[in-house]
Amino acid sequence: MKRTLILFTMLFFVFITACTNEKEKEKTNDEPSSSENQPIEKETVVSPLTGNAATGNIDSRPIAVTINNHPKARPQSGLNKADIVYEALAEGTITRFLAIYQSEKPKIIGPVRSAREYFVDLSKGYEAIYISHGWSPTAKEMLESEHLDYLNGLFYDGTLFWRDSTRKAPHNSYISFENVVKGAKENGYSMTKEVAPLPFLSDEEINGISGEEMLEAVVSYGSKPEWRIKYAFDQQLGRYKRYSGDELTVDRETEEPVLLDNIFIVQMDHRFLDDYGRRTIDLNSGGEGILLQKGMMKRVDWKNVNGRILPYENGEQVKFVPGHTWINIVPDLDQAFQNLAEKGE
């Protein structure tokens, strides 16, 4: 009897202990951990060529468009939506633009003009579909022999491309982004591509931008006013406005100004190819450059990194301010670039 009582008492304590442990376990499982209480921070997805928060697919394939910059082609359509614009001499003192679009898709782009070999090379750095209306002999050879993806208005005039009746040829060829997609589909070109991102500054790094204060600067491609480009830093907007002569560069459809965050002026060797004033430009050797960011000027070097023209200082890559970038390619930096403050303008 005594043994039975002892055994019963022991079993009772084992049962009570087990119940208590189970309740504590249930209580622990019911209570969320401190890490579960923390709000989950959603990582911001940024566009690879602007560094700004993405509003569309970041794997959208870039398109590169040669845009006319003759005075009769101004104002242009779609320049305000370009992530990057390269400006270079095409014939004589006339420049053209290579506009790279990835983060935004303008409804209308143009006037579209003929291809140049250096623009084709630059477009390859972004694995872009190349858009032009016409081509130089060397650009034609490159596009065809290298089997690059392109749409040329010579073959789509009146279909994918159209003529604006209010302007005269060759300053009146336009294409819509919708027709770019249509043409790409017809030719079996992919419209998606993993795009390697450019290097961008953080907010903290932007506050630490150093250099010489320069709120206005000029890049000249010729002696005439229409080839004199002025960049003016708007301190309220924190961005640059671009002028051709005294005329603000705006979008033809919306009249919105082209606003820029990085102005990169680079000196490259130019050589004439023919009697039309066509040139070849050395995109590969590197050289001197000037970088304008947030009202500051810095003398840098440039390098071609996988087909992209990027700034370097003391061998280290200089990052861009997030936003839109304009790259001026000039034959002689000292001759082309002017600090308006030094001139007293």
Please describe what each predicted stretch is.
Residues M1-L5:
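Positively charged n-region of N-terminal signal peptides that target proteins for export
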Residues L7-T9:
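Cross-family signature of deubiquitinases and ubiquitin-like deconjugating cysteine proteases
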Residues F15-A18:
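C-terminal motif of bacterial Sec signal peptides marking the signal peptidase cleavage site
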Residues T20-K23:
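Bacterial signal peptide processing site
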Residues E26-N29:
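Long, intrinsically disordered low-complexity tracts enriched in Pro/Ser with mixed acidic/basic residues
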Residues S35-I40, V46-S60, I67-K81, E91-E345:
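A surface/extracellular/periplasmic glyco- and lipid-processing/surface-interacting theme
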